[in-house]
């Protein structure tokens, strides 16, 4: 897990607003340990640099709450979003705990908003090997349509890189998410350049939290 933590440190030091731990093959104990280490790491970066990167856990509500993570992200294979959100809001998680939901259509996004999600991921916007199971790329025009239809923040995902991040942000998306820009084969400079490109292009005012 040292490589994963190294990527998290790179993202945090570059000023990423958050990192999402998406390790679907890890058992509960190993995932718990990784998340705790990630939380300690970003706390160190916060003390060193003042950057406040949040840690979100993909799919595992139980691990996210037990570790004290900042939130959970729910996908199509997770517990139903409506049930998870209700449980969190009824005292199962701290008040500031964030719940996000992956969506692949306007209908999905509206359902997530109605259920009480704090934000949604929408995509794939562009072609991405990790997102092909969810259909063809939807493009910037569809991203704009969905972003304008929602009252909660929308994060664009799927094939996002430093060259097209600004295009996504210009549609009204609150932010972008990327996997390939932080994989092991990517240099630290490339990861930093990606975060800088996102921050320089983002003029949208959103608060994805209750802090």
Where does each model-flagged region fall?
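Glycine/threonine-rich flexible loop motifs
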Residues: 130-132
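A short, flexible beta-alpha/helix-coil linker loop
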Residues: 126-128
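Short hydrophobic "strand-cap" motifs at the C-terminus of beta-strands
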Residues: 157, 179
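Acidic, Mg2+-coordinating phosphoryl-transfer loop and its flanking beta/alpha structural elements
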Residues: 174-178
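Conserved N-terminal beta1-alpha1 strand-loop-helix module at the mouth
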Residues: 1-119, 137-141, 145-152, 161-171, ...
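Flexible, gly/ser-rich surface segments that form the specificity/activation loops bordering the active-site cleft
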Residues: 123
